[in-house]
Amino acid sequence: MGRHKKPETIYDIHEANDRLADVFRNHGFDLVSHSQRQQLAHFYRLLMLNQEKENFTRLLKLRDVAIKHFIDSIIIMKYTDLQFPLLDVGTGPGFPGIPLKIMYPDQQILLGEGVQRRVEFLKHVRSEMNLKNLDILGRNINKHCVYPVRGAITRAVEDIGNTLGNVMSCLEIGGRVYFMKGPGVGPEIEAAKKDWGEYYKLVQDVAYSLPQTPHERRLVVYEKIKNMPLPEEDEGEELLMDELSNEEKRRWAKY
């Protein structure tokens, strides 16, 4: 099989920006400004520069990435109000966290990812794009993690109930968990009600499609209503905030 062309021989950032504008316009998606499109174009270029080595996504064409990654990550802005600081659980190469960071430049977002090569890529993106108020947590988010946030979001395939348990210790009362799911999520919702109904209430369940496509989605949002005791640490587990700056640790000490 032939090798993919290097992305810099296909698009520069300005050309990618123009093509993104066409895609967003053709799909009736008008939430993104010129400067935000340029940042998304920069992110696309970084993804493609590292794609051959890392295989972050099976999507390579700009149009496909724009619809199935960029629009898919930020369309929830139409349907819900996000709470910050916001933790992206299992972000992979940065979805939905990086596009959301571009849309909310002044808000604090944390990217949780346990695969080291992805962590290094995320740090590279943060540096190359000069993204502020973006922390990268190089570990899996589980029940032993204590990173105080007001919201958690995930586009990962993990079961709703598992994620609710894993972020329990991170959320204050009233904190919200945003699940970006497919249309067949009903059984997960029923199981979560049975297992977690004492601690979370379902506050939103919105069915929608990506604009001008047949791709169906469900946004499922839970609000934390009750604390549960912190779990005992397993041997070898540490409750670390090692990726956060001392300033951030002090600022969040009030939570």
UniProtKB/Swiss-Prot annotation:
Its main location: cytoplasm. Residues 233-245 have a biased composition (Acidic residues). One of its GO terms (molecular function) is rRNA (guanine-N7-)-methyltransferase activity. It is found in: Cytoplasm. Pfam families: GidB. GO terms for cellular component: cytosol. Its EC number is 2.1.1.170. It is an enzyme of class 2 (transferase). Keywords: Cytoplasm, Methyltransferase, rRNA processing, S-adenosyl-L-methionine, Transferase. Residues 246-255 have a biased composition (Basic and acidic residues). Residues 233-255 are annotated as: Disordered. Specifically methylates the N7 position of guanine in position 527 of 16S rRNA. This is Ribosomal RNA small subunit methyltransferase G 2. It comes from Bdellovibrio bacteriovorus (strain ATCC 15356 / DSM 50701 / NCIMB 9529 / HD100).
